């Protein structure tokens, strides 16, 4: 009997310490909040509720007609998917406007027959970001993206796919600079 009693006496302090530590841990966890954001946005939703994304007109020398609408909608869609901001045409707490300033083809590598083997398609967009909540975060900047394709293919055959890729890249860069702060 004395042997069993010794074991239970030794367990009592360890059990008490465990209970105390567990209680302290529970109190700390209930008083602290840990938040993980996987979209990278650093928006204070108590002060910033909306973003307006104006249409981006195409002022480039070479014009691909759907580009203006595709870019504007691509940017709006990204903010709708990645944030809780209300996306408006105008009058938002955050404002994005700009224009397509460049859409050009450049010959890249030269093949053995002295003709271009690859062509680079470059899209350039000038953006004005106005933060009406924190004006010091407003900026004006140009964004570019490019894609290359085999020169044996016609631009009309690859244009839609290449533009979609470039629009996605530019929209993500704009998003990162405006609300993600990366």
Where are these regions (language model features)?
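N-terminal secretory signal peptides that target proteins for export/translocation
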Residues: 1-14
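Short polybasic linear motifs
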Residues: 12-13, 21-24, 28
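A structural "domain/chain start" motif
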Residues: 31-73, 77, 84, 176-182
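Surface-exposed short loop/turn segments
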Residues: 39, 81-86, 93-138, 146-157, ...
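Short coil-to-beta-strand
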Residues: 47-49, 137-143
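Second-shell loop/turn segments in exported
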Residues: 57-64, 153-161
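Compositionally biased, intrinsically disordered linkers/stalks adjacent to structured regions
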Residues: 159-182
